[in-house]
């Protein structure tokens, strides 16, 4: 299941979050951006359950992550 995860990050933590997110299984790439959100991550997981685990159990628990918004690719 492919998705874009938009991540808002506490000031001063963007580089740390990009580095940590990039190393997670299922994350294809993560990029810091100007403006909000601070980080865009493109992920690809086998199914919705794995996507949920990646976002809720891993990304949202990283130090500096304030909020995530997930957009599932439909095409």
Protein language model features and the residues they cover:
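A compositional/biophysical signature of low hydrophobicity enriched in polar/charged and small residues
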Residues: 1-75
């Amino acid at each position: 299941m492919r998705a874009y995860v938009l991540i808002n990050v506490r000031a001063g933590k963007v580089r740390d979050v990009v580095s940590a997110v990039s190393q997670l299984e299922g994350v294809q790439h993560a990029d810091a951006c100007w403006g909000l959100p601070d980080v865009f991550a493109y992920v690809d997981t086998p199914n919705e359950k794995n996507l949920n685990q990646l976002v809720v159990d891993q990304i949202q628990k990283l130090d500096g992550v304030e909020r995530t918004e997930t957009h599932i690719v439909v095409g």
